[in-house]
Swiss-Prot record:
It comes from Homo sapiens. Belongs to the GOLGA8 family. This is Golgin subfamily A member 8Q. Transmembrane segments: none annotated. GO terms for biological process: Golgi organization. The keyword Lyase does not apply. Keywords: Coiled coil. GO terms for cellular component: cis-Golgi network; Golgi cis cisterna; Golgi cisterna membrane. Residues 38-50 have a biased composition (Polar residues). It comes from the Eukaryota.
Length: 632
């Protein structure tokens, strides 16, 4: 509204100036010349500001001489005309002064508007600087995300190399298992020889063997307690990993919400800038229209010519400033468009990252399904404890009862063991892993009187059934290993062949290290891998010691040799291939030659550089050991 009023005032002032110069320019010089011709004293009276008094004029005329009344009338008429002209000129001069004052006021108003526009421009520049700072922060966050992805790729490579080493170790463990089976067969042969020799032994010798079998069962109980503790540790570590994953997911959601808020604020500021630019363009168009109007010719004898020139110069200067502001606004609009494009790209990237995180969460849920097997294993361990109690009761009764009662009890025991040995045949491939962790089998009870042929035949049949059961369990273990290997291979292949992900955003082994983690996640994963190597070396040392003990027992059979069921149970516990990743590794594990491999050295170095990391991670080694060797 203020600009329109100024524009109207300028137009009215210009019209008044035109009318004034059109009216007064041709008349004023003619009147002046005529007055000069008639009487030379009239300009003096005009400059003095009034006409001569009648008395003076009369006296002047009397000095010259007597004149007629007609000449007096002729002289009075031009004086009156001159007085009227002087009055009109004074009125016009006052009007011109008023117009000059109004122009000065308009000039002040224009200057005030220019100051306000300068302030608005300064505010816009401040907003632009803030936008640039926000863009720089977004770029820094983008670089941080790229570094996190690079660290995840590096840890993925380490895990792939470690999986290769673990596959080699798996082959070594399978070889150890074959050697143990041979030792077990040798022990079974020795037991058969012992059974033949026991026909001539006394009852005291059998009681001594029963005592040793009880001791062996106590050892098996200790092993079961250790397995239970390991299961509990695995469950605790699994819960810690789940909490870690949830914390990372919450942090990513917070980052996404902050980014969305910043984008909304940037959009609002952009809209405000666009409105300001439109207002400036409107004001510029109005000023251009004012400049385009033709100016009236300047009067030669007006005293306000200098002020009008000054006003013109100021108007030209204002027009130049407005043009520069228009150029700046155009540049700002271009920058805003580029910023909008960058913000859209960042929104798309963030949306893709959200989709990837959701996919990873779904994959983690799918990979967490096999962990339900641990509950089944706990139930089976409870059932094995009950069986051990039953075996104890049966062995206490064997010393007092007859051969027939002992054979009947052995048949019942074999039936119960058959039921426990094959719990998952009708439930598909998901329950096959529970058969690999079967309860330790008790030593077969030896009857008191082996002199009869029927007792010997029943005892041999019992041993054959035990051997058949052990072979069947081994076959099922192999089937479970193949099934789990194929399943892991499919999942890892799906994660690695994912479009756009390229194994960057997918964490190997159940997603324990996700993409939103900080730089310490790489050291944490390396420490977990180093602890896993140490624990697995302990496992290999235990296998070697057990193998040496089995060979010694096969070469030197004696009354203190372990029963075949003990070795079978130990073999089954050895085939669990599941180790808790604790930092309390023994000295024998530290001296394992497998740590000298090139793939294990960088992991151990990262673990030494970042102590304390990896103590809370949980990665079951049986999952990593059965991963396929993926060639690049």
């Amino acid at each position: 509204m203020a600009e329109e009023t100024q524009h109207n005032k300028l137009a009215a002032a210009k019209k008044k100036l035109k009318e004034y110069w059109q009216k007064n320019r041709p008349r004023v010089p003619a009147g002046v010349n005529r007055n000069r011709k008639t009487n030379g004293s009239i300009p003096e009276t005009a400059t003095s500001g009034g006409c001569q008094p009648p008395g003076d004029s009369a006296t002047g005329f009397h000095r010259e001489g007597p004149t007629s009344s007609a000449t007096l009338k002729d002289l009075e008429s031009p004086c009156q005309e001159r007085a009227v002209v002087l009055d009109s000129t004074s009125v016009k001069i006052s009007r011109l002064k008023n117009t000059i004052k109004s122009l000065k006021q308009q000039k002040k108003q224009v200057e005030h508007q220019l100051e306000e526009e300068k302030k608005a421009n300064n505010e816009r520049q401040k907003a632009e600087r803030e936008l640039e700072v926000q863009i720089q922060t977004l770029i820094i966050q983008k670089e941080e995300l790229n570094t996190d992805l690079y660290h995840m790729e590096r840890s993925l490579r380490y895990f792939e190399e470690e999986s290769k080493d673990l596959a080699v170790r798996l082959q070594h463990s399978l070889q150890c298992k074959g050697e143990l089976e041979r030792a077990l067969s040798a022990v079974i042969a020795t037991e058969k020889k012992k059974a033949n020799q026991l026909s001539s032994c006394s009852k005291a010798h059998t009681e001594w063997e029963l005592e040793q079998s009880l001791q062996d069962q106590a050892l098996l109980k200790a092993q079961l307690t250790q397995l239970k503790e390991s299961f509990q540790q695995l469950q605790l570590e699994r819960d810690e990993c789940a909490e870690h994953i949830e914390g990372e997911r919450a942090r990513w959601h917070q980052r996404m919400s902050k980014m969305l808020q910043e984008i909304c604020t940037l959009k609002k500021e952009k809209q405000q800038d666009m409105r300001r630019v439109e207002e400036l363009e409107r004001s510029l168009s109005k000023l251009k229209n004012q400049m385009a109007e033709p100016l009236p010719p300047e009067p030669p004898a007006v005293p306000s010519e200098v002020e009008l020139q000054h006003l013109r110069k100021e108007l030209e200067r204002v027009a130049g400033e407005l043009q520069s502001q228009v150029k700046n606004n155009q540049h700002i609009s271009l920058l805003n468009r580029r910023q909008e494009e960058r913000i859209r790209e960042q929104e798309e990237r963030l949306r893709k990252q959200e989709e990837r995180l959701q996919e990873q969460h779904e994959k983690l849920r799918q990979l967490a399904k096999p962990q339900s097997v641990f509950e089944e294993l706990n139930n089976e361990n409870k059932s094995t404890l009950q069986l051990e109690q039953q075996v104890k009761e049966l062995q206490e009764k064997l010393g007092e009862e007859h051969l027939e009662a002992a054979s009947q009890q052995n048949q019942q025991l074999t039936a119960q063991l058959n039921l426990m040995a094959l719990p998952g045949e009708g439930h598909g491939g998901e329950h096959l892993d529970s058969e690999g962790e079967e309860a330790p089998q008790p030593m077969p009870s030896v009857p008191e009187d082996l002199e009869s042929r029927e007792a010997m035949s029943s005892f041999m049949d019992h041993l054959k059934e035990k051997a058949d059961l052990s072979e069947l369990v081994k076959k099922q273990e192999l089937r479970f290993i193949q099934y789990w290997q194929e399943r892991c291979h499919q999942k890892i292949h799906h994660l690695l062949s994912e479009p756009g992900g390229r194994a960057k955003d997918a964490a190997l082994g159940g997603g324990h290290h996700q993409a939103g983690a900080q730089g310490g996640d790489e050291g944490e994963a390396a420490g977990a891998a180093a602890d896993g190597i140490a624990a697995y070396s302990n496992y290999n040392n235990g296998h070697r010691k057990f193998l040496a003990a089995a060979h010694n027992s096969a070469d030197e059979p004696g009354p203190g040799a372990p029963a075949p069921q003990e070795l079978g149970a130990a073999d089954k516990h050895g085939d669990l291939r599941e180790v808790t990743l604790t930092s309390s590794a023994q000295g024998e594990a530290r001296e394992d030659p497998l740590l000298d491999k090139p793939t294990a050295q960088p992991i151990v170095q990262d673990h030494q550089e970042h102590p304390g990391l990896g103590s809370n991670c949980c990665v079951p080694l049986f999952c990593w050991a059965w991963l396929p060797r993926r060639r690049r």
